[in-house]
Amino acid sequence: MKYLAAYLLLNAAGNTPDATKIKAILESVGIEIEDEKVSSVLSALEGKSVDELITEGNEKLAAVPAAGPASAGGAAAASGDAAAEEEKEEEAAEESDDDMGFGLFD
C-alpha cells in the first residue's frame, strides 16, 4: 500500500513514477524499502492510468460482501453459541492489529 501511495503522490504532482522517485518519497518519511516490491508494483501498474486503477479498485470493492442481514429472534437463540465464538475470534483478530509498530503506510 505504501508503494501505491507513493506512486499516486508522484502521479498527482505531475511526475512520472519510477523506482528511484518512489524510494526517495518513502525514505523521506523513514520507511524501509524492499526493491522487489517496488519493482512488482511498477510492473503491475505499467501502462495503466490512475483512472483505470480507481475504476478497477471500485469494482473489486463492490464485489466484497457487506454485512449480512440481521437474523430473526428465534434463529438468534439457536445460533447464539456460534455468534459468541465468531465474536471472540473477531476480537482476537482486532487485538492483534493494535499498535504493532507499523507506520502510516504499513
Swiss-Prot record:
Compartments it resides in: Cytoplasm
Annotated organism of origin: Saccharomyces cerevisiae (strain ATCC 204508 / S288c)
Any one GO molecular-function label of the UniProt entry: structural constituent of ribosome
One Pfam family this sequence matches: Ribosomal_60s
Phosphothreonine carried by residues: T16
UniProt miscellaneous comment: The 4 small acidic ribosomal P-proteins from yeast can be classified into two couples of similar but not identical sequences. Each couple (P1A/P1B and P2A/P2B) is distinctly related to one of the two acidic ribosomal P-proteins P1/P2 present in multicellular organisms. Present with 428000 molecules/cell in log phase SD medium.
Family membership: Belongs to the eukaryotic ribosomal protein P1/P2 family.
Entry comment on modification after translation: Phosphorylation is not involved in the interaction of the acidic P proteins with the ribosome, however it is suggested to affect the ribosome activity and to participate in a possible ribosome regulatory mechanism.
Main location: cytoplasm
InterPro entries xref list: P1/P2_N_sf, Ribosomal_P1/P2, Ribosomal_P2
Assembly notes: Component of the large ribosomal subunit (LSU). Mature yeast ribosomes consist of a small (40S) and a large (60S) subunit. The 40S small subunit contains 1 molecule of ribosomal RNA (18S rRNA) and 33 different proteins (encoded by 57 genes). The large 60S subunit contains 3 rRNA molecules (25S, 5.8S and 5S rRNA) and 46 different proteins (encoded by 81 genes). The 5 acidic ribosomal P-proteins form the stalk structure of the 60S subunit. They are organized as a pentameric complex in which uL10/P0 interacts with 2 heterodimers, P1A-P2B and P1B-P2A.
Biased composition range(s): Low complexity: 65-82
Chain intervals with Acidic residues compositional bias: 83-100
GO cellular component, one term: cytosolic large ribosomal subunit
Region annotation Disordered: where it falls in the sequence: 65-106
Cross-link Glycyl lysine isopeptide (Lys-Gly) (interchain with G-Cter in ubiquitin) placement: K2, K48
Single GO biological process annotation from the record: cytoplasmic translation
Protein name per Swiss-Prot or TrEMBL: Large ribosomal subunit protein P2A
Function text: Component of the ribosome, a large ribonucleoprotein complex responsible for the synthesis of proteins in the cell. The small ribosomal subunit (SSU) binds messenger RNAs (mRNAs) and translates the encoded message by selecting cognate aminoacyl-transfer RNA (tRNA) molecules. The large subunit (LSU) contains the ribosomal catalytic site termed the peptidyl transferase center (PTC), which catalyzes the formation of peptide bonds, thereby polymerizing the amino acids delivered by tRNAs into a polypeptide chain.
Chain positions found as Phosphoserine: S40, S43, S49, S96
Keyword list, A-Z: Cytoplasm, Isopeptide bond, Phosphoprotein, Ribonucleoprotein, Ribosomal protein, Ubl conjugation
